[in-house]
């Protein structure tokens, strides 16, 4: 059995933000989201989040999770004091307690799994996660006895110059045998530089204490300011990019590309520079995406090309070509082998297979059939100032350049709309619709000038 305590009560003053530190986003998730997600491999009995500064906002962000118990730390008097708040909640509990910090978002689930399983195999009263750092400044140092058992943890600010030379640091992640920790928590003191209750002091009262060293020291990096937040984002993206390149995806200029963990990519996909893939985006096989494109929560079929475009909450079927400079949004659905070209916006519309919308058009609340050709400058005028109205264009119909379709309106199959027309009435199948003023010519016209 293992219970979990996530320490999330700090003010995070170095973030210089009105937002609680654990609610700052690292990619697609908050810091607290990521810490909670790392618990997935574990069989957790109870999960506590200890809150303090702006605790109500932290609670609100996870109000949908009934498996999380929030515990208030009204005064921020140190990590030991935070865990003391669990005493009334875990009275009589006989399992282990895993303690994490809410601002250490890069820990992998398998690392926590190794820590907990190692602790339970060893029979130790406490097991801590450690790392070897080339620049350990700011981290507590871990000191072991001749048998390699942990005997002391000294916070960086309390270390002597000689003690600061020790590269083995405390990651701030612990697994305790709860009955043992419960017995010593009341003994913690504030006899230190910060006059706080350090959880690390409990180590001096417990025996035996073991350690598990993390293989990748980047996992333990904490976030205290915006610089560290940016550095953690870089590390996270390196992980994701490496994963996809090893899986058969080509990333041209990888450091200019960002990909959320929730994105799924097929094989032989090429991602060009300055492309950003977010949310629950799925991209099929043999696609070329970018450069300079943003795709969010969208499904892209096999063989699709996207250039310099913004796509959100939309679907694109196989072998279609999007862009450059297209904008698809609001549940746009593009069929197979379509072309959505330069400066075209498609919003809440369905475009049938092999339909071309090549340039300078807006399709809103529209349904287009198959093999439709939309001329340059065609606009669906879908909004009357109060409500949105639909436009329907049947199979194989064509709209001439600079046409305006005033919704609600239905264009039948095999219809031709003459260039420059403003259509505000339904057009039957097979018809030619012309709705423009007749051209007149005045020969020998003298253009007026301002000269008298």
UniProtKB/Swiss-Prot annotation:
Subunit record text: Homotrimer.
Residues annotated to bind Mg(2+): 103, 224
Ligand binding (UDP-N-acetyl-alpha-D-glucosamine): 7-10, 21, 73, 78-79, 140, 155, 170, 224, 329, 347, 362, 373
GO CC, one annotated term: cytoplasm
Record-given protein name: Bifunctional protein GlmU
Protein species of origin: Synechococcus elongatus (strain ATCC 33912 / PCC 7942 / FACHB-805) (Anacystis nidulans R2)
Record-linked CDD domains: GT2_GlmU_N_bac (cd02540), LbH_GlmU_C (cd03353)
Annotated function: Catalyzes the last two sequential reactions in the de novo biosynthetic pathway for UDP-N-acetylglucosamine (UDP-GlcNAc). The C-terminal domain catalyzes the transfer of acetyl group from acetyl coenzyme A to glucosamine-1-phosphate (GlcN-1-P) to produce N-acetylglucosamine-1-phosphate (GlcNAc-1-P), which is converted into UDP-GlcNAc by the transfer of uridine 5-monophosphate (from uridine 5-triphosphate), a reaction catalyzed by the N-terminal domain.
Pfam families the UniProt entry points to: Hexapep (PF00132), NTP_transf_3 (PF12804)
NCBIfam families: glmU, PRK14360.1
Catalytic activity reported: alpha-D-glucosamine 1-phosphate + acetyl-CoA = N-acetyl-alpha-D-glucosamine 1-phosphate + CoA + H(+); N-acetyl-alpha-D-glucosamine 1-phosphate + UTP + H(+) = UDP-N-acetyl-alpha-D-glucosamine + diphosphate
Molecular function as annotated in GO: glucosamine-1-phosphate N-acetyltransferase activity; magnesium ion binding; structural constituent of carboxysome shell; UDP-N-acetylglucosamine diphosphorylase activity
Chain intervals for the UniProt region annotation (N-acetyltransferase): 248-452
Catalytic site: 359
GO biological process, any: cell wall organization
InterPro entries: Bifunctional_GlmU (IPR005882), GlmU-like (IPR050065), GlmU_C_LbH (IPR038009), Hexapep (IPR001451), MobA-like_NTP_Trfase (IPR025877), Nucleotide-diphossugar_trans (IPR029044), Trimer_LpxA-like_sf (IPR011004)
Top-level lineage group: Bacteria
Keyword list, A-Z: Acyltransferase, Cell shape, Cell wall biogenesis/degradation, Cytoplasm, Magnesium, Metal-binding, Multifunctional enzyme, Nucleotidyltransferase, Peptidoglycan synthesis, Repeat, Transferase
UniProt region (Linker), positions on chain: 227-247
Binding site for acetyl-CoA: 376, 382-383, 419, 436
Subcellular location: Cytoplasm
Pathway: Nucleotide-sugar biosynthesis; UDP-N-acetyl-alpha-D-glucosamine biosynthesis; N-acetyl-alpha-D-glucosamine 1-phosphate from alpha-D-glucosamine 6-phosphate (route II): step 2/2; Nucleotide-sugar biosynthesis; UDP-N-acetyl-alpha-D-glucosamine biosynthesis; UDP-N-acetyl-alpha-D-glucosamine from N-acetyl-alpha-D-glucosamine 1-phosphate: step 1/1; Bacterial outer membrane biogenesis; LPS lipid A biosynthesis
Transmembrane portions of the chain: none
């Amino acid at each position: 059995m293992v219970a979990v305590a996530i320490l999330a009560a700090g003010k995070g003053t170095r973030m210089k933000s009105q937002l609680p530190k654990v609610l700052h986003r690292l990619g697609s998730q908050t810091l607290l989201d990521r810490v909670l997600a790392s618990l997935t491999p574990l069989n957790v009995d109870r999960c506590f989040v200890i809150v303090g500064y702006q605790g109500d906002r932290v609670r609100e962000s996870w109000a949908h999770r009934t498996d999380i118990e929030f515990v208030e730390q009204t005064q921020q008097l140190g990590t030991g004091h935070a865990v003391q708040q669990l005493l009334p909640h875990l009275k009589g509990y006989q399992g282990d307690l895993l303690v994490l910090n809410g601002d250490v978002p890069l820990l992998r689930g398998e690392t926590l799994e190794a820590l907990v399983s190692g602790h339970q195999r060893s029979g130790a009263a406490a097991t801590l996660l450690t790392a070897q750092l080339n620049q350990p400044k700011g981290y507590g140092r871990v000191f072991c006895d001749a048998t390699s058992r942990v005997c002391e943890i000294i916070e960086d600010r309390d270390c002597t110059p000689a003690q600061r030379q020790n590269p083995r640091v405390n990651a701030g992640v612990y697994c305790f045998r709860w009955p043992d920790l419960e017995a010593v928590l009341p003994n913690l003191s504030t006899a230190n530089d910060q006059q706080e209750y350090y959880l690390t002091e409990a180590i001096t009262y417990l025996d035996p204490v073991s350690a598990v060293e993390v293989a990748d020291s980047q996992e333990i990096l904490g976030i205290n300011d915006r610089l560290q937040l940016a550095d953690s984002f870089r590390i996270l993206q390196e992980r994701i990019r490496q994963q996809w390149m090893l899986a058969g995806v080509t990333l041209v200029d990888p450091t200019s590309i960002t990909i959320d963990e929730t994105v799924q990519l097929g094989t032989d996909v090429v991602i060009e520079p300055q492309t950003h893939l977010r949310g629950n985006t799925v991209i099929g096989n043999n696609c070329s995406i970018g450069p300079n494109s943003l795709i969010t929560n969208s499904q892209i079929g096999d063989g699709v090309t996207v250039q310099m475009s913004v796509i959100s909450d939309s679907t694109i079927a196989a072998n279609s070509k999007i862009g450059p400079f297209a904008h698809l949004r609001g549940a746009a659905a593009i069929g197979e082998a379509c072309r959505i070209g330069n400066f075209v916006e498609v919003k809440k519309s369905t475009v049938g297979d092999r339909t071309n919308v090549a340039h300078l058009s807006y399709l809103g609340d529209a349904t287009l059939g198959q093999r439709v050709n939309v001329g340059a400058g065609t606009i669906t005028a879908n909004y009357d100032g109060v409500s949105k109205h639909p436009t329907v264009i049947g199979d194989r119909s064509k709209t001439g350049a600079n046409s305006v379709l005033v919704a609600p309106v239905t264009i039948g199959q095999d219809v031709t709309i003459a260039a420059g027309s403003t259509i505000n009435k339904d057009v039957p199948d097979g018809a030619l619709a012309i709705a423009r003023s007749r051209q007149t010519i005045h020969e020998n016209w003298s253009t007026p000038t301002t000269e008298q």
